[in-house]
A protein has these predicted regions:
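Membrane-interfacial loop-to-transmembrane alpha-helix junctions, especially the N-terminal start
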Residues: 70-80, 131-138, 184-194
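Membrane-interface capping segments at transmembrane-helix boundaries
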Residues: 121-125, 228-243
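Short juxtamembrane and helix-loop transition motifs at transmembrane-helix boundaries
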Residues: 13-16, 32-43, 63-71, 93-100, ...
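Hydrophobic cores of alpha-helical transmembrane segments in multi-pass inner/ER membrane proteins
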Residues: 51-62, 107-122, 169-182, 216-231
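N-terminal topogenic module of multi-pass integral membrane proteins
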Residues: 2-96
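Membrane-proximal helix-loop-helix units in multi-pass membrane proteins
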Residues: 101-177
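Loop-to-transmembrane alpha-helix initiation sites
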Residues: 100-105, 207-221
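Aromatic-anchored segments of alpha-helical transmembrane domains
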Residues: 81-89, 141-152, 195-207
Length: 249
């Protein structure tokens, strides 16, 4: 199903200008309508897959909180699936209809999926643990928020068919940020694309008025601070573990 037809942007701007409405406002309204039409087409076409992805993510999250922790490779596989799904099903198939830059976004998301698959599934370097510290609280708040994301948007927009739901880039990024804060063995490279998307998606959230995405900058800043703090602690630890050579006079 394609997106519903609307007047092109030039026609909209001309009409709004004749009505005395600022062009910047007209552009924002047009972009918002086009985006929500896109969400409607996306949700209608792939909703069964979105339900499966949400259930899988919720089950893994609950198991991670319980004593029956799922295998780390399963969690890494789920994260890789999130990113490749957003790359292909959302960016490449749908978002490119209204934004050519979506091809670049799709490429970034494919890279992130490949990183998770390589580090977590092939090499098995990622270990997701139930920590008990301040960062764990932040991590679980982000995970919970991402799972509640469809409901938060539904409260604001009221129409399920036209809202951003699970299985789109923004909740994927928030969910990923939370799990990365619970992961041992995660390289800082795994945080690059998620942080980039918190900037891109966060700016779009304010333009389109998607309030559920206002959490993106918080997720991004939290992940940056967490990653820098972890890298600093690792550097200090390695410095203390390096054998010192004493030179006797």
């Amino acid at each position: 199903m394609g997106t519903p037809a609307h007047p092109d942007l030039a026609s909209v701007l001309l009409s709004r200008a004749e009505d005395g409405i600022p062009i910047s406002h007209a552009v924002a309204v047009h972009e918002r309508r086009s985006s929500f039409d896109l969400f409607a087409a996306y949700n209608t076409a792939v909703w069964p897959a979105l339900v499966v992805l949400w259930i899988a993510s919720a089950v893994v999250s609950v198991l991670l909180l319980s004593s029956r922790r799922p295998p780390d490779r399963w969690i890494s596989t789920l994260l890789a699936a999130h990113w490749i799904w957003s790359a292909v099903a959302y960016h490449a198939v749908f978002f490119t209809r209204i934004n050519p830059a979506a091809w670049l976004f799709a490429a970034l998301f494919v890279v992130q999926a490949a990183l998770f698959f390589w580090a977590g599934v092939v090499q098995g370097r990622l270990s997701f643990t139930l920590r008990r510290n301040a960062w764990a609280v932040v991590a679980w708040l982000l995970v919970a928020y991402s799972l509640l994301y469809p409901g938060i948007n539904a409260v604001q927009h009221l129409t399920w068919s036209r809202i951003p739901t699970f299985g789109v880039p923004c909740p994927t990024t928030i969910f990923t940020a939370g799990l990365l804060m619970l992961a041992r063995g995660a390289s800082w490279r795994l945080s690059i694309v998620p942080v980039i998307w918190t900037v891109i998606g966060g700016s779009a959230a304010f333009l389109l008025g998607v309030r559920a995405d206002y959490a993106l900058p918080i997720a991004g800043m939290s992940l940056v601070i967490f990653t820098l703090q972890k890298s600093s602690a690792r550097g200090v630890r390695e410095a203390h573990e390096t054998p010192r050579i004493r030179v006797r006079p």
